[in-house]
Amino acid sequence: MTLAVYPGSFDPFTLGHRDILLRSLKIFDEVVIAVGVNQNKKTLFTPQERVEMIENEVKEINLPNNNKVTVECFEGLVVDLARKYDAISLIKGVRGPVDYDYEAQMAGMNTVMCPEIETIFLMSKPEFS
């Protein structure tokens, strides 16, 4: 079974996030949606509200091939959460070069801390960018 972690603030969980999730489920058997908690970041919704919104959205999706989606909050390093789940990859959606530059730097740091976990970049579809 292949498992990936899809981290983000998801404030709120958008159609673009949903699209990245569905495309990820074509690659991985299980995806853990990791709702990041950053006390220094002002958000519209609390972490628990975001988790509940995502769980409700996932319930409406007809998951392909008996895939599984788990949603949870996390604080700290995403690689620590990935290790907890024995994930093989981190999934990052990118809308363009600015997102990519930032996410590539983060992926580099994650690779230094946890070289066994690959970061997979999925480009957002134009209608969701």
Model regions and ranges:
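Nucleotidyltransferase catalytic core that binds NTPs
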Residues: 1-129
